[in-house]
């Protein structure tokens, strides 16, 4: 699972 943090304060997580 990869989690990406964006400056917007939202966190997106998706599995590769």
From Swiss-Prot:
Post-translational modification note: Position 16 could be leucine amide or isoleucine amide.
Residues modified as Leucine amide: 16
Main location (coarse class): secreted
GO biological process, one term: neuropeptide signaling pathway
Annotated localization: Secreted
Function of the protein: May act as a neurotransmitter or neuromodulator.
GO cellular component: a single term: extracellular region
Similarity comment: Belongs to the allatostatin family.
Modified residues (Pyrrolidone carboxylic acid): 1
UniProt keyword terms in alphabetical order: Amidation, Neuropeptide, Pyrrolidone carboxylic acid, Secreted
Domain of life: Eukaryota
Lineage start: Eukaryota, Metazoa, Ecdysozoa, Arthropoda, Hexapoda
The protein's name: Allatostatin-3
Keyword Transmembrane: no
């Amino acid at each position: 699972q990869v989690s990406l943090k964006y400056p917007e304060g939202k966190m997106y997580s998706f599995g590769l």
